[in-house]
Amino acid sequence: SEQSLHRDTPVFCTSPGDRYMGVWTALDAVDDSNGPLRVVPRSHLLPPIDVQALRRKVFGDGPVSAMSPEGWTAYQDAVARQCEEAGLQPQAVHVQPGDVIVWHPQLFHGGAPHPSAGTRRSVVMHVTPKSMPVGHMDVFYGQTPSAEKAPWRYYRRGRREIARFGQVDFGHEYTRRTWFLRKA
């Protein structure tokens, strides 16, 4: 989907930090005609943003909600300025079906416009170690302490343990129950 350049960390914040990876698997061939993933190479190596100073600037002494549009925009704008000052430019990533892109939590990335009628189907996941607590903006900006352990239960598939969430949700306006995935 078309998305402005961003880092996932404000809405996918782990403690200790950066203990996850983004994984994007192409189901269709993707080029400039159907909205490729855009990445800013080396943006994950930039110095950290002072999120406490940013919190004071955006929220003052007020509360920070788990999904704050103001907190999201302020952070992403700060990262964009850092990338520009460092001379880093976004690059489109063209892929074939089955190609997998794995990225660091601090990599600035987004989805380019999709000008054609063609599809750009993909599967996107964020993967953490087992029991890794994940917080949102209230944790990212330091208002809410990070949980010591993730609250979800796991089920076993062979030697793997998979978190049981029950719904697909990443702070979007919608959630989707996962029972329909089991019918296939």
Annotate each predicted stretch with a short phrase.
Residues 22-26, 90-92, 100-102, 122-124:
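Conserved hydrophobic/aromatic beta-strand scaffold that supports enzyme active sites
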Residues 5-8, 77-86, 119, 138-143:
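Short, surface-exposed loop/helix-turn segments at secondary-structure junctions
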Residues 7-10, 24-25, 87-89, 107-110:
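Glycine-rich, charged/polar anion/phosphate-binding loops
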Residues 14-16, 36, 49, 112-114, ...:
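Short, function-defining helix-loop hinge/capping sites that tune catalysis or transport
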Residues 17-20, 55, 72, 120:
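A structural signal for well-ordered alpha-helical scaffolds and beta->alpha junctions
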Residues 1-40, 44-46:
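Conserved double-stranded beta-helix
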Residues 54-57, 97-102, 106-184:
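Non-heme Fe(II)/2-oxoglutarate
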Residues 33-108:
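Double-stranded beta-helix
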